[in-house]
Amino acid sequence: MEENLAYQIDYTANFNKSFRREFQAQKIAECCSPDEFTILYALHFNPNISQSELAKLLFKGKAHVGKMLNKMESRGLIKRVADTRNNIIIKRSIITPKGTNIFKMGHKEFLKIKEKIQENFSKEEMEQFINYLGKFRRIISTIVDVKLK
């Protein structure tokens, strides 16, 4: 198992999920879930991101993400406003001051993780690692086509 690449990637993915839960609980508090924080993160860096794009980012269905957005709005983390995109009426999500405070707190902690990683990996190693992960996904996608929700 130790030398099996697929196992190592799966193990790392599971480790990362556990890490995110613990990181969230210890560093960001219980004000939002890891997925909700990912939504805040995405909205901060891409304010025009659509619900469909959020669903792909989170590997969740559009309806599920819609429920999450509604819950986040009811808790005052975001505000959803009617807007148009390509002549289609959509609900655009805007981070509220409360959501911005949570984002800033989490982002500050995230930067500590990023710094730790950069201390241990060169820029070239990071680029190579990212390329290898992309290559792995492309290879296994030729066996079973994974549809993102």
Where are the predicted features?
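N-terminal positioning helix adjacent to the helix-turn-helix/winged-helix DNA-binding module
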Residues: 5, 34-36, 98, 125
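Alpha-helical linker/hinge and terminal dimerization helices associated
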Residues: 12-23, 58, 102-118, 136-147
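Charged, amphipathic alpha-helical coiled-coil/dimerization segments
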Residues: 71-131
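N-terminal helix-turn-helix DNA-binding core of bacterial DNA-binding proteins
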Residues: 20-64
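Short, locally clustered residues in the helix-turn-helix/winged-helix DNA-binding domain
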Residues: 41-45, 107, 134
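N-terminal leader segment of winged-helix/HTH proteins
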Residues: 1-30, 77
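C-terminal regulatory/oligomerization modules of transcriptional regulators
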Residues: 1, 123-149
